[in-house]
Regions:
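N-proximal helix/coil linker or "cap" segments that precede and/or mark the start of modular domains
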Residues: 143-191, 205-208
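A short beta-strand-turn-helix
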Residues: 193-212, 238
Length: 321
């Protein structure tokens, strides 16, 4: 009996050891560093350092990087560089010419090296009413375009750049644009209730009659922190004219409260720890800002950080100036 027990323990040990070894192998593969070529590495380093540059220098550097990436031979790293640059190019006001070069580069990379469709996701829909001869959950695959196409469609839809006709006819690009349009439709018809740092409850629909600027942010987000003083300045300047600014964070109050206190932010900061409102607005990256007019219509939005000058232009669309 003792020998059988010992044998089971030995077998269990080796099974556990194999599982741990497999987990370590997977973790190691996931953390494997990207290997850049001699031509790619300097560009990757420059992209990594963009946020440390002054805005006027950053604009020129971003444009120069877009042109240099375009000259690289086709590769997965070339696409990676183009996507990374695109994600940073919208953090402020670097000029239309700069954004156009970034979009042109991303489009050209996708033309020369198209990204395959990702594996379909499986959506599970639980039946609310019992059906005869059926039980459990119904599933259906949904096809999401690859992220680079979403990134390019985002630049076109929200930054108003242009891309070649053959890209706009691409099936994944069209799917990405359709997804963005559907997301905006959701944002047109929503309501939510959240509590602020003091425990006061705020309901979005009860703010009709005011221009409401909803800003999604986090304490760890550099561009969020950078635009916070401009949001505070706008709130102080236009609150008497009916502007309400609502900051929404998915972090704990213990992190948010000292940050807000140290920066003397006076507009309401709401907590969304379960990310229900983030999901309602389809927020997948921050900062994101949505501006609603006095009738509750979505009048303007920004996909990234904005300068005070840019915010003023957006507020004009909602009737604040």
């Amino acid at each position: 009996m003792k020998s059988k027990t010992l044998l089971r323990r030995i077998e269990f040990f080796f099974v556990l050891l194999s599982l741990v070894t497999f987990a370590l192998h997977v973790a190691s593969a996931q953390q494997k560093e990207i290997v850049w070529s001699a031509d790619e590495k300097p560009l990757a380093d420059q992209i990594h350092g963009l946020r440390a540059l002054a805005d006027d220098v950053r604009a020129g550097t971003t444009k120069d990087l877009a042109l240099k990436i375009r000259q690289l031979p086709p590769s997965a790293n070339k696409l990676r560089l183009a996507v990374n640059l695109s994600g940073l190019s919208t953090e402020g006001d670097f000029g239309r010419d700069t954004l156009q070069e970034v979009a042109t580069t991303l489009a050209s990379v996708l033309r020369e090296r198209p990204v395959p469709w990702p594996e379909p996701k499986i959506e599970t829909k639980t039946e609310t009413k019992p059906e005869p001869k059926a039980s459990g959950a119904a599933t259906k695959p949904t096809r999401e375009p690859a992220y680079p196409y979403i990134e390019l469609a985002t630049l076109v839809r929200y930054e108003h750049v242009e891309v070649p006709l053959d890209i706009t006819n691409d099936e994944q690009y069209r799917a990405a644009m359709a997804r963005l349009e559907a997301d905006d439709h959701k944002r047109e018809h929503l309501d939510f209730t959240l509590k602020d740092l003091s425990g006061k409850t705020w309901t979005f629909s009860e703010l009709r009659g005011k221009v409401v600027l909803v800003n999604f942010w986090a304490t760890w987000c550099p561009p969020c922190r950078k635009e916070m003083p401009d949001l505070e300045a706008l709130y102080e300047r236009f609150s008497a004219k009916g502007l309400m600014v609502l900051g929404i964070s998915d972090e704990e109050a213990a992190k948010v409260e000292p940050f807000i206190r140290d920066r003397k932010v006076s507009f309401p900061v709401l907590l969304d720890p379960e990310r229900k409102v983030n999901e309602m607005f389809v927020v997948e990256g921050i900062p994101k800002t949505f501006i609603y007019d006095r009738e509750g219509k979505l009048a303007a939005q920004s996909i990234d950080m904005r300068t005070q000058k840019q915010f003023l232009e957006l507020l004009k669309k909602a009737g604040i100036e």
